[in-house]
C-alpha cells in the first residue's frame, strides 16, 4: 500500500457536512447492512448532524435485525438515540399501494404509465423521495439491496424523468380530445365540472412530481450532496462486482470514492493454522488487486468477526472501526498454544505418513 494513499477510513464521509444522500451497497452477503447501520450511528453521534435517517431498500429488510427493533415504512426513532431514525421501504410496490398514488387515480395516466418499463417501481420510489424531502433530515443513508437492484434504483430518477415527461407530452397533445370526453362522461355520470377538471388536476400532480424527481436527480449527481460507499470482501466475485458497480456509478455520474473491504483475516490473528494461512494468502492477493485498481479511493479494511454485530450498543462499538484504521490484536496465549498444538499435530501426521510410505517400499 502506498504511503500517499487517501486516509483508509470513512472519516471523510462524516466530515463532509453537506452530504445529503449516502448510498451503501455491494454484492449480497458482504456486510452492507452492518456497514450502513454503523455509518448512520457514526453520523448521528458525530455532533455534525441534528437528524439522520437510514432507509432500507432491500426487500430482505435486515435493518430491523441489525438494530433489534422493528421498523416500518414510516420513520421511527431508533432506541438509544435522539437523532437517528430508520425506515424500511420496498421499491417494488404492491397493487394496493399503487392504487393509492394520486397519479394512479386517472385511468388514462395509469394506462400510459403501464406501458413504460420500470415506471411502477420508479413512481413508488418517487413517492418515498417526495415524503423524505418534506422531512427535516440532514443526511439520509440508504442500506441498498444487492448490486443489480441498487443500480436499477439509482436509475429510477432517469426513468421517471423520461416517463413523466412522456405522460405530460401525451396528455398535453391529447388534452383537448380527452377534456371533451371527460366532460361528456362527467356530465352523464352527474360528476359536474369537478369531474371534468380531474385530469388537469392530476396532470398538475404529475408535473409537480416531475419537479421533485429532477431536483433529486440533480442532487444525486452532485458529489457535494451524494456519495456511494461500496462494500465488498477480498474474493474474486466480489472484486469483479465492485469493479462493475464503480463503472456503472460513473455512468450515472454518482460519486464513489470509498470502499469498505469486509471479513478480512489478518495474519496477526491466525496463529499458525494452515487453513487460515491459506485463506490469508488468498485474501492478500485480492487486497493487492483492490489497491492497484483503486489507488485514489479511501479503502477501509474491516476484520472477520467472531460474533454478529446486532443491537445499538454493538453497532456503536463497531462504528469506531469506520473512523480509524483497524489494528488487529495479537493472538492470546491460549490461542497461541492452541495454534501451536494444531501445527505440531499436523507435523506429526505428516511424519507418520512419510514413515508409512517408507515402510511400504520395503
Curated annotation (Swiss-Prot):
What do the Gene Ontology cellular component annotations say?
A: cytosol; endoplasmic reticulum
Give the annotated active site: 58
Q: Name one GO molecular function term.
A: ATP hydrolysis activity
Pfam families recorded for this chain? ArsA_ATPase
Tell me one GO biological process term. Answer: tail-anchored membrane protein insertion into ER membrane
EC class (word): hydrolase
EC assignment: the record states 3.6.-.-
Q: Where, per UniProt, does this protein localize?
A: Cytoplasm, Cytosol; Cytoplasm; Endoplasmic reticulum
Task: Supply the alphabetized keyword list.
Answer: ATP-binding, Cytoplasm, Endoplasmic reticulum, Hydrolase, Nucleotide-binding, Transport
Question: Could you tell me what this protein is called?
Answer: ATPase ARSA2
Source organism of the structure: Chlamydomonas reinhardtii (Chlamydomonas smithii)
Originating gene = ARSA2
Amino acid at each position: 500500500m502506498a504511503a500517499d494513499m487517501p486516509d483508509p477510513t470513512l472519516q471523510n464521509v462524516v466530515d463532509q457536512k453537506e452530504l445529503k444522500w449516502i448510498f451503501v451497497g455491494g454484492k449480497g452477503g458482504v456486510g452492507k447492512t452492518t456497514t450502513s447501520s454503523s455509518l448512520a450511528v457514526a453520523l448521528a453521534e458525530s455532533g455534525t448532524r441534528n437528524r439522520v435517517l437510514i432507509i432500507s431498500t432491500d426487500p430482505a429488510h435486515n435493518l430491523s435485525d441489525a438494530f433489534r427493533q422493528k421498523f416500518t415504512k414510516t420513520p421511527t426513532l431508533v432506541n438509544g438515540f435522539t437523532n437517528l431514525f430508520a425506515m424500511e421501504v420496498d421499491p417494488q410496490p404492491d397493487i394496493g399501494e399503487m392504487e393509492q398514488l394520486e397519479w394512479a387515480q386517472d385511468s388514462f395516466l395509469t394506462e400510459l404509465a403501464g406501458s413504460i418499463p420500470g415506471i411502477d417501481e420508479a413512481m413508488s420510489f418517487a413517492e418515498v423521495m417526495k415524503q423524505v424531502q418534506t422531512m427535516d433530515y440532514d443526511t439520509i443513508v440508504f442500506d441498498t439491496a444487492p448490486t443489480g437492484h441498487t443500480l436499477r434504483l439509482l436509475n429510477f430518477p432517469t426513468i421517471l424523468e423520461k416517463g413523466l415527461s412522456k405522460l405530460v407530452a401525451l396528455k398535453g397533445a391529447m388534452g383537448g380530445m380527452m377534456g371533451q370526453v371527460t366532460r361528456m362522461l362527467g356530465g352523464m355520470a352527474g360528476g359536474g365540472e369537478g369531474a371534468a377538471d380531474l385530469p388537469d388536476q392530476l396532470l398538475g400532480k404529475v408535473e409537480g412530481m416531475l419537479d421533485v424527481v429532477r431536483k433529486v436527480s440533480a442532487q444525486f449527481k452532485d458529489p457535494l450532496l451524494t456519495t456511494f460507499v461500496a462494500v465488498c470482501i477480498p474474493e474474486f466475485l466480489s472484486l469483479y462486482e465492485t469493479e462493475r458497480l464503480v463503472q456503472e456509478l460513473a455512468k450515472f455520474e454518482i460519486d464513489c470514492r470509498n470502499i469498505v473491504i469486509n471479513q478480512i483475516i489478518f495474519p496477526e490473528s491466525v496463529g499458525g493454522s494452515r487453513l487460515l494461512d491459506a485463506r490469508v494468502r488468498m485474501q492478500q492477493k485480492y487486497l493487492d488487486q483492490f489497491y492497484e485498481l483503486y489507488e485514489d479511493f479511501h479503502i477501509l479494511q474491516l476484520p472477520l468477526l467472531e460474533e454478529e454485530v446486532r443491537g445499538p450498543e454493538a453497532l456503536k462499538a463497531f462504528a469506531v472501526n469506520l473512523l480509524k484504521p483497524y489494528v488487529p490484536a495479537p493472538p492470546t496465549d491460549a490461542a497461541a498454544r492452541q495454534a501451536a498444538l494444531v501445527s505440531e499435530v499436523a507435523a506429526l501426521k505428516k511424519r507418520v505418513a512419510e514413515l508409512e510410505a517408507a515402510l511400504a517400499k520395503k
